[in-house]
Curated annotation (Swiss-Prot):
The keyword Transferase applies. This is UDP-glycosyltransferase 74C1. Pfam families: UDPGT. Transmembrane segments: none annotated. Signal peptide: none annotated. UDP-alpha-D-glucose binds at residues 281, 336-338, 353-361, 375-378. One of its GO terms (molecular function) is UDP-glucosyltransferase activity.
Length: 457
């Protein structure tokens, strides 16, 4: 049972699943500490509001200025249109909510949308910036915004090492993709950097990490801002189990039916024998890269489970899926319950794009990683996975950005059965323990959440 309700908080995530999920998870934690939450999703599709049965969380959509017939990624290109329309919609929503029987006290917003801070301040709300990505990438973006780091004109002509507080030296290949080369992602470069344009006006700053994971970076950050690290916000079943009904990222009223076929297939494999491959919901690999991965998997001879979206399946080699099924050596699935998969005893390693949510999930469940980073924060995450936390290895690319089948296979074998793989398993088990301690009762992140609740009541 949750405590008597103490306050009402609005959540405003950037409308991508990787940003929405950490917001939902924090709302669940706050619900059990007596806070009522409203999740506001900017969308071109109107949905009727609904309230979760298990939590005091209501979900509303507001219009983002786009229409159903437009490309789903249009909002990521026409940023001004998204900003202007969503600003109006958010202002109207908050103004109306303040007239309700349970008016909100605070807005927790994604810094990808700094305009939300200005709106909330104008409407007299306590304003909280919530970074759903790690400090690793955010610190780089901060220094670009401050002018203390210059993005090179050409990453290949200027391969100098970059230095940031609390970081090891970073090569150009270790930096977030938006920080590697001027002009490569002009709109998105501005988008991620302007997170810091008004951050000092926030009343509180949260991040989906934990103190023990990024200690040197966290120390520097704490000297700059009122930072509270409240992660990892992975569903409670896979961490402290204090919210036994919290088994996935969905809310009770929006749950999809689980696909038991994947877990049944894994149940017939020996312990730590399966290579799990997944590249998230946004990454679209080239056909050439997909074929290199497929050949690498076949070359290693390990059982494999590969999550491949329907839109990507045509990039696989002809006959690859059928051959795997015929030999019972692998399974290519359109969707998998990733947390359940990573928690399964049959999984030996995780071949991943190193997105932050996937990285935290692997770390929390003690699964070694083979990193194949693509863009955004992923290269920096991969650097820390391999060289700082030492919980995986990173696949290298050639001059054209392609990872060869030989390189991918080498890394998989190294993690699955090499001497380095043994050390990696020890290291990821240590971090697994630290992650669970942080979010468990009395842990560093749990204390930060309690401190945050106290600010709201």
């Amino acid at each position: 049972m949750s405590e008597a309700k103490k306050g009402h908080v609005l959540f405003f995530p950037y409308p991508l699943q990787g940003h929405i999920n950490p917001m939902i998870q924090l709302a669940k934690r706050l619900s059990k500490k007596g806070i009522t939450s409203t999740l506001i999703i900017a969308s071109k599709d109107h949905r009727e509001p609904y309230t979760s049965d298990d939590y005091s969380i209501t979900v509303h959509t507001i219009h983002d200025g786009f229409f159903p017939h437009e490309h789903p990624h249009a909002k990521f290109v026409d940023l001004d249109r998204f900003h202007n329309s969503t600003s109006r919609s958010l202002t109207d929503f908050i103004s109306s909510a303040k007239l309700s029987d349970n008016p909100p006290k605070a807005l927790i917003y994604d810094p990808f949308m700094p305009f939300a801070l200005d709106i909330a301040k104008d409407l007299d709300l306590y304003v909280v910036a919530y970074f759903t990505q790690p400090w690793l990438a955010s610190l780089v973006y901060y220094h670009i915004n401050e002018g203390t780091y210059d993005v090179p004109v050409d990453r290949h002509e200027n391969p100098t090492l970059a230095s940031f507080p609390g970081f090891p030296l970073l090569s150009q290949d270790d930096l977030p993709s938006f920080a590697c080369e001027k002009g490569s992602y002009p709109l998105l470069h501005e988008f991620v950097v302007r997170q810091f344009s008004n951050l000092l006006q926030a009343d509180c700053i949260l991040c989906n990490t934990f103190d023990q994971l990024e200690p040197k970076v966290v120390k520097w950050m704490n000297d700059q801002w009122p930072v509270k690290n409240i992660g990892p916000v992975v569903p409670s079943k896979f961490l402290d189990n204090r919210l036994p009904e919290d088994k996935d990222y969905e809310l009770e009223n929006s749950k999809t039916e689980p696909d038991e076929s994947v877990l049944k297939w894994l149940g017939n494999r020996p312990a730590k024998s399966v290579v799990y491959v997944a590249f998230g919901t946004l990454v679209a690999l080239s056909e050439k890269q997909m074929k290199e991965i497929a050949m690498a998997i076949s070359q290693t001879g390990y059982h494999f489970l590969w999550s491949v979206r329907e839109s990507e399946r045509s990039k696989l080699p002809s006959g690859f899926i059928e051959e795997a099924e015929e030999k019972d050596s692998g399974l290519v699935a359109k969707w998998v319950p990733q947390l359940e998969v990573l928690a399964h005893e049959s999984i030996g390693c995780f071949v991943s794009h190193c997105g932050w949510n996937s990285t935290l999930e692997a770390l929390c469940l003690g699964v070694p990683m083979v990193g194949v980073p693509q863009w955004t924060d992923q290269p920096t995450n991969a650097k820390f996975i391999e060289d700082v936390w030492k919980i995986g290895v990173r696949v290298r690319t050639d001059g054209e950005g392609l990872s060869s089948k030989e390189e991918i296979a080498r890394c998989i074998v190294e993690v699955m059965e090499g001497e380095r793989g043994k050390e990696i398993r020890k290291n990821v088990e240590k971090l697994k323990v630290l992650a669970r301690e942080a979010i468990s009762e009395g842990g560093s992140s749990d204390k930060k959440i309690d401190e945050f609740v106290a600010l709201l009541t």
